[in-house]
Amino acid sequence: MFASLTSEQKLLLKKYKFNNYVKTIELSQAQLAHWRSNKDIQPKPLDRAEILRVEKATRGQSKNELWTLLRLDRNTASASSNSSGNMLQRPALLFGNAQESHVKETNGIMLDHMREIIESKIMSAVVETVLDCGMFFSPLGLHAASPDAYFSLADGTWIPVEIKCPYNYRDTTVEQMRVELGNGNRKYRVKHTALLVNKKGTPQFEMVKTDAHYKQMQRQMYVMNAPMGFYVVKFKQNLVVVSVPRDETFCNKELSTENNAYVAFAVENSNCARYQCADKRRLSFKTHSCNHNYSGQEIDAMVDRGIYLDYGHLKCAYCDFSSDSRETCDSVLKREHTNCKSFNLKHKNFDNPTYFDYVKRLQSLLKSHHFRNDAKTLAYFGYYLTHTGTLKTFCCGSQNSSPTKHDHLNDCVYYLEIK
């Protein structure tokens, strides 16, 4: 599986596959306080170097397996379906992809013109033109964009280029298209594009803000934090290039949407960590007593299985299991948990079952100034702080003085599940 991926791409897939990435999201108290007062996450989790690392590893786009895999479930600028089953679109898609490459490779004058526009508007020199563009992540990592090309400026700015090659205009020039427009209006929409053009005189093009292509470009500018972009449409013998300014209102809405989603994932992850303590899971049934009819014995059975109650939804603190609290206890307990790390093991198999709960291990480690900075990682790997101030695993009883090395017995069931 994933045979075409390099070792670097496999690392990126493991880290940034959407379902993996969102489970790592957490907020510090400072970040949470900043979000509450400013509705913005600072600092952002992804820096420029990491964003470019992903972009370079996903070049080739649809020909690159990593690009396809990272798009799954992620909010992309095109907002298109991840799987296209419409066979009627295939000729148009194949034509468009081939023509986009041709446009980039054979139109140096167009690119020179774009550079002149950029440098006159932004007052910063273009230092690199990337024609084989991969996928850009936003600094929060939830949204992504894959323009057809981009310019990199001396001041660090990125400018996206989106190229459209409508199949319908493969044999139609701009003037032929204008002739076919009506006569009652001064301007007309150009079908299959986001363009608006005047009927008479020298053609003057502008973008329609309600069109999907306009929104796609604005999402690209949001993800890349670009002040502008270029929208290119190919006709038979013509290229139409429109410079598109950043729509701050649109981008602010995108920012708000992504910030809220990021916080929601962080809260969900925080809940999962909190509910890895059995007492917290049991308390959840008491807190939400109006949302269930389970007996005390049934609650104990579900708590032992790692389940807690969250506003009418039964969830597992160790995996993605979810169920409605109206479901019977027997039915809930019979359902399978996929990739669950609760293991449902008997405590007698552990060296010190008192520290089976992650939270208890974490609390013990936080008492040590020496291990405090690595407490979360150590607790995850099963370590707790003994009364003598040393590290020991609750599962197989291994002791270790180095917080960066995780030594468990070869047959340790807990470590075999989490490593």
Curated annotation (Swiss-Prot):
Location within or outside the cell: Host nucleus
GO molecular function, one term: endonuclease activity
Gene3D superfamilies: 3.90.320.10
Pfam families: Viral_alk_exo
Entry GO terms, CC: host cell nucleus
Disulfide bond annotation, renumbered to this chain: none
Enzyme class, spelled out: hydrolase
EC assignment: 3.1.-.-
Superkingdom of source: Viruses
Presence of the UniProt keyword Nuclease in the record: yes
Family (UniProt): Belongs to the baculo-herpesviridae alkaline nuclease family.
Role according to the record: May play a role in maturation and encapsidation of viral replicated genome, by promoting DNA homologous recombination. Exhibits endonuclease and 5'->3' exonuclease activities. The endonuclease activity displays a specificity for ssDNA in vitro.
Protein name: Alkaline nuclease
